[in-house]
């Protein structure tokens, strides 16, 4: 998994979610 540079501690992944990233361990990762 590649870190997308977005945190998802308080809110879900927003911008990076459009790039295919998902929340894992409080950080947005791309599979």
UniProtKB/Swiss-Prot annotation:
Cross-link (Cyclopeptide (Ser-Asn)): 1-31
Pfam families: Cyclotide
Keywords of the record: Antibiotic, Antimicrobial, Disulfide bond, Knottin, Plant defense
Posttranslational modification: This is a cyclic peptide.
GO biological process, alphabetically ordered: defense response to bacterium
Cystine pairs: 4-21, 8-23, 13-28
Domain-related comment: The presence of a 'disulfide through disulfide knot' structurally defines this protein as a knottin.
Family in the record: Belongs to the cyclotide family. Bracelet subfamily.
Job of this protein: Probably participates in a plant defense mechanism. Has antibiotic activity. Inhibits the cytopathic effects and replication of the human immunodeficiency virus. Active against both Gram-positive and Gram-negative bacteria.
Protein known as: Cyclopsychotride-A
Organism: Psychotria longipes
